[in-house]
Curated annotation (Swiss-Prot):
Recorded consequence of changing E288S: Abolished gating by EMRE/SMDT1, leading to reduced mitochondrial calcium uptake
Residue list for modification N6-acetyllysine: K332
Protein name (database record): Calcium uniporter protein, mitochondrial
Family matches, as Pfam families: MCU
Entry's localization field: Mitochondrion inner membrane
One Gene Ontology term, aspect cellular component: mitochondrial inner membrane
GO BP: any one term: glucose homeostasis
Post-translational modification: Phosphorylation by CaMK2 in heart leads to increased MCU current. The regulation of MCU by CaMK2 is however subject to discussion: another group was unable to reproduce these results. Phosphorylated on tyrosines by PTK2B/PYK2, promoting oligomerization. Glutathionylation at Cys-97 in response to reactive oxygen species (ROS) promotes MCU higher-order assembly, leading to constitutive activation of the MCU channel and mitochondrial calcium overload.
Membrane spanning stretches: 234-255, 263-284
Amino acid sequence: MAAAAGRSLLLLLSSRGGGGGGAGGCGALTAGCFPGLGVSRHRQQQHHRTVHQRIASWQNLGAVYCSTVVPSDDVTVVYQNGLPVISVRLPSRRERCQFTLKPISDSVGVFLRQLQEEDRGIDRVAIYSPDGVRVAASTGIDLLLLDDFKLVINDLTYHVRPPKRDLLSHENAATLNDVKTLVQQLYTTLCIEQHQLNKERELIERLEDLKEQLAPLEKVRIEISRKAEKRTTLVLWGGLAYMATQFGILARLTWWEYSWDIMEPVTYFITYGSAMAMYAYFVMTRQEYVYPEARDRQYLLFFHKGAKKSRFDLEKYNQLKDAIAQAEMDLKRLRDPLQVHLPLRQIGEKD
């Protein structure tokens, strides 16, 4: 009977519940009649609501980036006395520092080096264009300040907006170029003397260093040259002695031993043999048999033989001599008044 009563009660509940309201009423009655069943359904609904809330909260989260975007007020650009002054808040001490740059001569690399020298805590610094392209270190400051850019220091990104400046007209640009040329000439005229002195001092120091390296080699060369000169002189005197001996023998045979009729063919063959020897010298040396050149050749043969025997570094000696000659030539050109760009009147007075 209990089972039949339970089935009739369930049929009654199902007949009363229709749609959303019926479901709510059924739940209430079920909870009232069966407390355990109502608690379990209530916990299940609460769990589903919690899951949907967590998913919605995760979907509403934004993307997280590694770098921090800092307002542009931390980096400002102003012009003072015609020069751009960039104020940057340094990351280590969190204080502002001004950098005065020269728009013509300075570049992006100079500005970045100044930042790293001023704050040793900067590990990475770079400049990017608004679309994310890195600006080269060789780019001039005047070109950088024509448009907005991004300054990245470590993990901070600064959006910099330089003040817009009016571009010069063609006439003003030409006048500015003339002024730059005049200033450069004036600077050269005023500083040329100091530049000349510094360059002259540098060349003199180089000459002294080269001569100091050449001194020990020069002593060895002088000794080898002295021996080669001595041997060459002996060869020359030996040739003269040979010719004198030959003359004496021919004279003895011509006037004392035999007659001229017999010695004439002998002297002819001796003369012809001497001509053949000179021609053989030309074939071997590709030089004409002239006494000064023959003497110099013999001297060089003795010199190189002595240098090889003494292990003299002839190549290094020649390089040092060439370097000294070049330095002396540069020093002479440096002291030439025409190279100093002096006015014509002063050059005329010196001449």
